[in-house]
């Protein structure tokens, strides 16, 4: 297994605490249109704990949560949208759908007191999977500034 695949796999395994950090995974990741681990989650090749699914968006619990609630929301079809910096006008609808779905999931998860939305973009933004995804984190008091 290549170093890059090992790091990306560690992001979704319980042993990730002893594996590579998110920063290392982001620095090892290569932006491309190649299938990602999220494509395998969408196709159910890799199990996940789904909390929301419709025809456009899949939301599931992060395997390495950064709060009591940590959910990833992804578009089911990437359409070249590997990161926010790659967004084009044709992506407006799915970007809005991801954020609106985050609001629905936050309500479903009981996050009435607030939550944080994060989109990492590129190596310096700590993006480790090049399939745009929204982190919904809540259930605790957040700090400012973030990382």
Swiss-Prot record:
The keyword Plastid applies. The active site is at residue 133. PROSITE patterns: HIT_1, HIT_2. Its main location: other. A motif (Histidine triad motif) lies at residues 131-135. Substrate binds at residue 135. Its EC number is 3.6.2.1. One of its GO terms (biological process) is sulfur compound metabolic process. The keyword Plastid applies. It is found in: Peroxisome; Plastid, Chloroplast. It catalyses: adenosine 5'-phosphosulfate + H2O = sulfate + AMP + 2 H(+). Transmembrane segments: none annotated. GO terms for cellular component: chloroplast; cytosol; peroxisome; plasma membrane; secretory vesicle. One of its GO terms (molecular function) is nucleotide binding. Residues 37-147 form the HIT domain. It comes from the Eukaryota. Keywords: Chloroplast, Hydrolase, Nucleotide-binding, Peroxisome, Plastid. Possesses adenylylsulfatase activity in vitro. This is Adenylylsulfatase HINT1.
